UniProtKB/Swiss-Prot annotation:
It is found in: Cytoplasm, Cytosol; Nucleus. GO terms for molecular function: RNA binding. It comes from Drosophila melanogaster. The gene is SNRPG. This is Probable small nuclear ribonucleoprotein G. The keyword Transferase does not apply.
Length: 76
């Protein structure tokens, strides 16, 4: 099994991020933590549904293998 390398996302800590997830889902929130497998903790998270509604879901942990794309919404 290959060893995971830590993702270089330290500079994005405490910044607002948008994550596209598998299954066409998308969330935005403030990055509070991550690990070498790109599992992330987001705070003040908002889920953007396909019918253009938004659900506030608070603090969440998202598994790295479900993340398709990451975009910084704040200046780094």
């Amino acid at each position: 099994m290959s060893k995971a390398h830590p993702p270089e996302v330290k500079k994005y800590m405490d910044k607002r991020m948008m994550l596209k997830l598998n299954g066409g889902r998308a969330v935005t929130g403030i990055l509070r933590g991550f690990d070498p497998f790109m599992n992330v903790v987001l705070d003040d998270t908002v889920e953007e549904c396909k019918d253009n509604t938004k659900n506030n879901i608070g603090m969440v942990v998202i598994r790295g293998n479900s993340i398709v794309m990451v975009e910084a919404l704040d200046r780094v």
